[in-house]
Amino acid sequence: MASVTSIDVDATQHLRDILKLDRTEDSINGNQRKSNSSFSSDLNGLLVTDQVAAVGTSLSDTNLCSAAVLNSERQVICLSGDDSSSCIKITGKDVEIVASHDSNICSKARGSNKVKIQPVAKYDWEQKYYCGNLIAVSNDYIAYATRGANGSAMVRVLSLTTAERILLKGITGSVTDLAFAHLKSNHLACLDEAGSLFVWQLTMTNGKIQDDIVVHIRRPENTVLSIFRRIIWCPYIPEENEENVVDDTSQTIALLHEDKAEVWDLEIIQTNHNTWPVDVSEIKEGFIIVKGHSGRLSEGALSPDGTVLATASHDGYVKFWQIYIEGQDQPRCLHEWKPHNGRPLSCLLFCDNHKKQDPEVPFWRFLITGADQNRELKVWCTVSWTSLQTIQFSPDPFSSGVLPGLKASLDLSAEFLILTDVQRKVLYVMELNQNQDEGKATFTSISEFLLTHPVLSFGIQDVNHCRLRNTEVLPAEEDNNSINQEEILECESVEAAAGVLIKLFCVHTKALQDVQIWFQPHQNAEPAILGTAQPQQENFALPDIQGINMERMPSMQGSMHGSQSDLCRISTDFLLLPTDSVPKLMTPDAFMSPSASLQQGITSPGSIISTLTTVTPISSTSNSDTVLARPSEEMTLSTMLQLDTSATLSNPSRDGNPLSNSRNPAVVIPGMSETIVSIPAAQMPSSNHPLELQDLDPLVVPQASPTRERSPDVISSASTAMPQDIPEIASETLQRSYISSVPSGLSVEGCESSHHSDSMSSAASALHLLSPHNLSSLDHGHRPIIIGSSVVENERISAPSLLESTIQEDNVDIGLPQPWPAAPDITKETRNNLVDSSRNGQDRGDSSFHRHNYHLLQQHDSQDASAEQSDHDDEVASLASISGSFGGKGQHLLIKDWKSKLSPRSSPKLRRKSKKDEMELAKSPRVSDHLVNLELQEELLCMLRSQQKELSDLRQNQLELMKKLTDHMDAVQSSIMGHVERVIDTQQEQEQRRVERILSDGHERNGQLQEYLSQQLSHSLSGSLSNRVDKIIREEMKKTVSQCISKTLDPVAAQLTSSVAAKVTAVEGVLKENVTKMVKSKNVTDAIGRVAADSLQTVIHSAYREAFQSIVLPAFERSCQSMFQQVNNSFKQGTQDYMQQLEAHLRSIKMNEQETRDPVVTQLQQMVDSLQTVTDQLASNITSNVRSEVQHQLHIAVGNMQDSILSQVQRIIKEEVSHAMKEQQAAVTSSIMQAMRSAAGTPIPSSHMDFHSQQTHILQLMQQGQINQAFQQALTASDLNLILYVCETVDPQQVFGQHPCPLTQPVLLSLIQQLSFDFGSRTEIKLNYLEEAVMNLDHSDPVTRDHMGTVLNQVRQKLYQFLQAEPQNALQKPARRLLIMLQGLVPPTLS
């Protein structure tokens, strides 16, 4: 293959052209990303740099976005495993990362709190370094390798939506690699140890996973099994504005084997082959083989266009190959180099953004390579082929013998590199920053997350950017999914800064787990300059509350004009015959519309459809995977909407001084097209608690009549111009009497990008604008009301609203918890009462655990319909006057009118004043003062009643809120106490275990010490006393013991001799007898034999072994040697003699054969000549005989065919003539009938065709297969003869034997009604069609249900008359069967 010398300049330039490396970047000027928030300077470990200048550098002052100049050349990062710290900043070009001691497998440190784990499947995987992937992840499925009970390899596929699972089998050896084509794909590829390729297409059918094999390429049976095989899909690049993903986009796949790489075009393979599996030897096209490495291939990558393959090998080389599958060109090496000085490579990652590809940014601009199981990573620039940064991973000093074995993977956006260590229970997340303009790419930070087990393989599902608060607005390119608020509270961060949520599936040594990590990375931009606003973020809208998206549907109108007049033409008694006995046959159009009873229900003035406005809430389905599971001990208000009233500004400076916005953002209220109210951002400290927003299920908004649907009580506008921009959120606890709504169309302008105020505070401010005293300002003069193009200062307004009072109290004392405020649209007297009650509730809430500020957005429904209608009219009038006036002095009056008429629950003084002004303007000199006084008294009485009712409602509301708040506090207190008790119990158990461990260690040390002392004592005593005791005992034995024994034993010996002699004689006889019996006993002999055998076995065995080894074996060897020598000599001599005899015999045989061959050859030649002559004669004879026989047979066959053809033609002509005669007879009969009708003076409609033309047209329709149209035309003509003609022409089985029935329900009903008119003639065909038509009626069809009873009742009556009139008819049996069928179908109520 190609070598280093074969690479020329043209090949390298071709690679640069493919990768778009020489393209200018002039158009890319404004794409640099900037962040608003300052970056935390907390470190997760110890940073050691070689240069002193880098030590004093402030982390928050570093511009990480450019990454052009690194602060130091050498940096050592010692990870500590501290979960409470932030991620560590990387500043050096050559960085060494030392693993923490807590990440060791033997360490008992707990996992990180930022990692949320959910078990998916339990299985024991072997802990080793896997070259391929054990798991593959897509948006809908996960697949992982496993083994069955018999040890065979399998792939388990699990659906993420339905939890349905299946097994994929047929794998040889074990699974070496798994991969989906891309995240949105349902094509799963698998490679086994034999190199066989499996590609399945996964689909969901009726809740079950269906696996269809798309490609199965099988290797030969003698293929060497290898675990070093990889799958590389061609990357999927989403198109701009692409919604539906076509799964056939990734049809190119590369397979890496030990010595070669293969690139396959699956589309060509599927086109050429239909059955699977297919042997690789049978495939002739659609693939290409790449060879050129001297070591084992470890990694690879395909370019997005599929024309370049990059391979990394254990020989240390990375090579780029130009490939063309469809052509005949061999792969050509474009470039090669050693990134790690020849060390074996284990990683090859190109830093391309596959989530959102910029067409101006070239592919393969930066490259990450890894060596020695990714213990060393390097970032490369593919333009200059220079190393930009080097990262080295080292073990901790306490376990230096266990080297890291890292698995690395980039997310789709190429912003984060995720690494797991097979030897340690840790996961690293490294943030990658790319600068296309400067040609720099570096790692800017690293985060360490401790796990419970080492990760052997993992698959990244998604990496989302999310805010710390749900109400924060994300940029358009970021995902708007956010994690649960309970999980955000655990992050202990008070800033509304951006965070990252990583979702991945990990294969541990014990289980497969769903892992979710939320952390706050470094901000890749400098702090924004005070007073400078970002243009792209000045205007932002309040987002919809997550999980709730309610849309108003347009009201349904119940008027029906066009169809009523047509329906009225249909008589309800259409089954009754007229006096002239002419049948009134119903056409199929009569059965197309609902019955009269249904029409009356629709057109009734009291109908629900015509009087009610249907409002349908639609809940947006959020991804359940993005919301983390909440801990069971944490409790939130499930029935209240919790909103934070503080507008928090992030502090980019290090000293934490609060900042105030220099501009006043404007809030646009939906429904007031020309009204813009400017609200300044409140200056708040940065220590406010984060927003806690409870996820609520969408509630159905109660339907209301048109007189109530535009009530000004609802905060959102009643206009239907943009209904999708006005979502409503209803609180469950206040559903009976209140409706809470949050307008989503609020737009805030002028907000600085570095200081985002709370969007929910803006919503509360917009709510405040709708209160009666909504124009009061905190800073007196900086909040003008803009109507049209004029500005009116708000110094006219005197009374502050409840929301402003709450904000002022928050500014005075931010440390005290704030109570629940009441509804904003209340009177001045009620507001004063509520302020007092709020202060009392604030004093009672000092000991509360919850320190958040809540606002309850609520509106009251008035029970007085007339007052509500009048309030609505006033509001419409005031809004019309405001929108119609634009300048001059009249604006002041308009604003006052708007203040007084905006809400029906405004202050009595303002209402009284506005009504008085209107009456003064409206009255004329002819109206008396008495009438004015009466009207004023009535108005005052109405106001007093409404105010009293509102006061009672508000008091009841306040009591309910206080009760709920007390219950919530009790629940929170119980939760905290339970949590504290569990923590104390856990700590006590840990201390108890530690004390027990110390005591056990002490006992163990004491036992070891005692054992050591006893051993030393015994050793010293045995050494010192053994010699002395031995000598003393020997001397004493010689001197005293022998003499004493001799003196004592002499008399005893004499006595024993005499007694023994006497007893021996007595016993001798007994012994002889007993011994004789014993010897003759079989058991004794067996026992003696066994004992003798046991005792002699070892001795005899050893003796025989020694004798055999010393005597037999040498003698046997010598004898065998001499014997084999003699045999060898004899064999040689015999072989030589045999060869001589064989040669002589062969020579004699050869001579004899040569003598006999010549005459045989001569005879064979003669026989061949004679055979040729005979063959020629036989050929001529056979040809003549065959020709004559064929002619004879053809003559006979032609004669038979003539006879049969004549008979067939005659029969066909006879049938056609008879059929034509029948048609002619029918035409003549119809002509006569028409002539008779015309003679009677009945006018013939001009639109009707004559009977013959109708028959012809119907016959054409039936010949074309349009059976329904043919029957419909015949039924529409209202002619029974035409209907019977169609029924006789078409067989009933041909019509009703199909499924579904080709005749529609109206046609069936009309056919039944017309055929049942008269059973006197052609009864059989009528009964056959009626039986089949009745059986094919669809009872679920509304038209059939409306008309079936009447039609079938008529058929039953006609059948009954027929049976009574003709009891002896042969068709009585089918008629009775049809009658019984009709009695079962027609209910008694319809008969």
Swiss-Prot record:
| GO cellular component annotations of the record | nucleus; P-body
Residues folding into a coiled coil are: 935-968
One Pfam family in the UniProt entry: Ge1_WD40
For bias kind Basic and acidic residues, which ranges apply?
Answer: 915-924
Q: Which InterPro entries match?
A: EDC4-like (IPR045152), EDC4_C (IPR049404), EDC4_C_sf (IPR044938), EDC4_WD40 (IPR032401), WD40/YVTN_repeat-like_dom_sf (IPR015943), WD40_repeat_dom_sf (IPR036322), WD40_rpt (IPR001680)
- Chief subcellular location equals cytoplasm
Ranges occupied by WD repeats: 170-210, 226-274, 292-331, 340-390
Sequence segments annotated as region (Disordered): 703-724, 897-924
User: What are the alphabetically sorted keywords of the record?
Assistant: Coiled coil, Cytoplasm, Nucleus, Repeat, WD repeat
Sorted alphabetically, the Gene Ontology BP terms of this entry are: deadenylation-independent decapping of nuclear-transcribed mRNA
Identify the PROSITE patterns for this entry. WD_REPEATS_2 (PS50082), WD_REPEATS_REGION (PS50294)
Enumerate the subcellular locations listed in this protein's record, separating them with semicolons.
Answer: Cytoplasm, P-body; Nucleus
Under SUPFAM superfamilies, the record lists: WD40 repeat-like (SSF50978)
N-terminal signal peptide: none
Family classification: Belongs to the WD repeat EDC4 family.
What does the protein in this record do? In the process of mRNA degradation, seems to play a role in mRNA decapping.
Spell out the protein name for this chain.
Enhancer of mRNA-decapping protein 4
Native organism is Xenopus laevis
Q: Which gene encodes it?
A: edc4
